[in-house]
Amino acid sequence: MIFVISPAKALDFETPPVTAAATQPDYLREAEELIGILRQKTPAEVAELMHLSDPLAALNVARYERWHRPFTPDNAKQALLAFNGDVYGGLDAPSLSEDDFAWAQQHLRILSGLYGMLRPLDLMQPYRLEMGTRLGNPRGANLYAYWGDTLAEALNRLLAAERDAGGSAVLVNLASQEYFKAAARAKLTAQVITPVFEDWKGGRYRIITFYAKRARGLMSRYAIRNRVEDVEGLKGFDAEGYGFAPDVSDAETLVFRRRAD
């Protein structure tokens, strides 16, 4: 079973990492090519392209200029510890054990506009490049064209290895639509399951964005801590009051609901 999540805009490169274990990203050559394209843009162009304020655009232009290989623990940080948004608050990576990180390294992947796909312990340098950014490149007008079938093929290899090892060849999509689109679902050869998280509000269950993002992180953490290897194990997710709702779930969508009475 393989889990995919989105990255985060917020980053934490100040807090020392809780583990020394680190690996190199698989798509550094591609990341370097994209950085080269971004370096050609002025702060004003970056602000327009990414809908950023002038200070944020200037910050990211400086990041592109500083970006360089090789990645080391002195100039980069493990991806699962570097991202710091709502999903990562729920995942709470700093409290994971070394064994947890080792399991996550095999079963969790982070989709990224710049790095393509990251393992939890892959070193990364700070950046801002959302997958939906219309950044022209040699392969097309946006990052979906740039990554093409690359990420789907990588996931297919991972899932085939899971199956060959006697595991469950199921991809659990905990990423946003923007990011999972880059995985080219039509090219994926394994079963895809998408968990949905709903909260009771205004007399009905609905998806509340902040809570849903946090819940994706909570489920990722649940899978890591409990070494979840199959769909039945996933249905046991019960963090922070959520519970599996079989009556509104199906083979492709697992719905988890929470109601605070």
Swiss-Prot record:
Listed under GO biological process in this entry are: response to hydroperoxide
Query: What are the record's GO terms for cellular component?
Result: cytosol
UniProt family annotation: Belongs to the UPF0246 family.
Q: Under what name is this protein listed? A: UPF0246 protein AZOSEA34360
Organism name? Aromatoleum aromaticum (strain DSM 19018 / LMG 30748 / EbN1)
